[in-house]
């Protein structure tokens, strides 16, 4: 587990400790005691102004109607109604939301915002703690072995780099076939005799698929509506440097910098988080120095810049605010990737437009963090990898339970 730090143009704003290391006290007392000395600039009076939000959190799930009322409200309006100080909003809540739900509070559902703050920070003292994988990546260490096991034991076929381009259904609603397209070659294909489909896609993918699947969209209009929801652009950067640079906290958040252009950003010192496994970070090249991973969220303006402009902003304007030694480091290799519309946007009033777990078509189910799970609902109804995983299991169980497929 690692601590993290929050940075602004004024310097270090706050640090988040490893909450599990502190005395385990009833929430929110444990969190309050663990962070009482961690805010470097925010006065106590501003911190205390957030108390009204705790009352609203208790009210949130009193009934579905109350939840939808909060969902229709944007988070900034709620904060101001609760008389949270502007300084608390701008110096703490706004940066947290830009890297937690990837949008500023005025663009987020108040309901989803409260759930994020509750389940990640208040429900359990150590829920905000993050443990980093010791080497390589989650994809290499967890997902790839799982994929190989499913392929070997259950004859799963994984079509990497392949999009579902059209879902063909019969007039009775049965799934007939799925048309595909290779991202690399543009080659098209068809998967026939489809028993069931799990739509594990975001709003952008759903909208694109439904636009090409007229019969499916007509029989399941809730999917077409879901495809009209917004999504968030992300930019990911990895930098390999010619020297090692020590940073006090290997996980960091940037906020309010002009170079961010309205985005939220994080950076992680991978060589510190994966100490002892540096060679894996450098592949077949000799180890030279630090390796940095940085992500920008709400990054439409960042994505319009060239790769070099993004790297220069990190090396010249952002990273030196944390450690001046970055100004003297040279980038020996770099990777910049853009992911347009890749993250769910939980905008005000979006809950009823989000796709349901079980659709109007018996053989089509949905999975993902934005899916409404009905009677199987639990936990935060917003951005959450664990929720997406559990929703995938529930989607498969739904098909089995209703006899659509056999297992």
Mark where each language-model region is.
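Flavin (FAD/FMN) cofactor-binding core of flavoprotein oxidoreductases
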Residues: 98-101, 317-359
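Active-site/ligand-binding neighborhood in enzyme catalytic cores
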Residues: 49-177, 181-184, 193
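Mid-domain catalytic core of redox enzymes
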Residues: 133-134, 162-292, 297-303, 312-313, ...
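Dinucleotide-binding Rossmann-like beta1-alpha1 core, especially the glycine-rich loop
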Residues: 1-56, 64-65
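Short, hydrophobic alpha-helical segments
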Residues: 150, 195, 396-406
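FAD-binding beta-loop-beta segment adjacent to the flavin cofactor pocket
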Residues: 279-285, 340-378
């Amino acid at each position: 587990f690692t601590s993290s730090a929050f940075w602004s143009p004024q310097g270090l704003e706050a640090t988040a400790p490893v909450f599990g290391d502190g005395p385990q006290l009833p929430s929110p007392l444990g969190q309050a005691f663990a962070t009482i000395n961690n805010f470097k600039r925010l006065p106590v009076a501003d911190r205390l102004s957030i108390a009204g939000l705790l009352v609203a959190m208790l009210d949130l799930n009193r009934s579905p109607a109350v939840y939808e009322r909060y969902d229709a409200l944007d988070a900034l309006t709620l904060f101001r109604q609760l008389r949270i100080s502007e300084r608390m909003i701008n110096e703490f809540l706004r940066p947290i939301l830009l890297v937690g739900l990837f949008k500023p509070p005025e663009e987020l559902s108040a309901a989803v915002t409260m759930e994020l703050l509750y389940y990640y920070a208040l429900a359990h003292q150590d829920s905000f703690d993050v443990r980093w994988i010791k080497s390589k990546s989650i994809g290499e260490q967890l997902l790839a072995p799982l994929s190989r096991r499913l392929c070997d034991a259950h004859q799963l076929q994984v079509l990497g780099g392949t999009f579902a381009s059209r879902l063909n259904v019969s007039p009775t609603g049965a799934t007939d076939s799925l048309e595909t397209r290779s991202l690399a070659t543009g080659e098209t294909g068809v998967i026939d005799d489809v028993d069931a489909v799990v739509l594990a896609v975001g709003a952008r993918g759903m909208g694109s698929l439904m636009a090409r699947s007229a019969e499916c969209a007509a029989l399941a209009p809730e999917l077409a509506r879901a495809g009209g929801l917004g999504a968030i652009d992300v930019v990911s950067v990895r930098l390999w440097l010619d020297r090692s640079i020590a940073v006090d906290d290997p996980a960091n958040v940037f906020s309010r910098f002009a170079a961010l252009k309205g985005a939220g950003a994080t950076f992680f010192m991978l060589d510190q988080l994966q100490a002892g496994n540096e060679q894996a970070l450098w592949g077949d090249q000799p180890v030279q120095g630090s390796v940095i991973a940085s992500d920008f969220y709400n990054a439409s303006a960042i994505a319009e810049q060239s790769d070099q402009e993004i790297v220069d902003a990190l090396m010249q304007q952002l990273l030196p605010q944390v450690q001046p030694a970055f100004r003297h480091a040279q980038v020996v290799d770099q990777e910049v990737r853009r992911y347009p519309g890749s993250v769910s946007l939980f905008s005000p009033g979006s809950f009823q437009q989000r796709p349901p777990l079980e659709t109007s078509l018996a053989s089509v189910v949905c999975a993902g963090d934005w899916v409404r799970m009905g009677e199987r609902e639990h936990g935060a109804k917003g951005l959450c990898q664990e929720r997406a995983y559990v929703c995938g299991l529930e989607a498969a169980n739904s098909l089995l339970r209703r006899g659509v497929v056999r297992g």
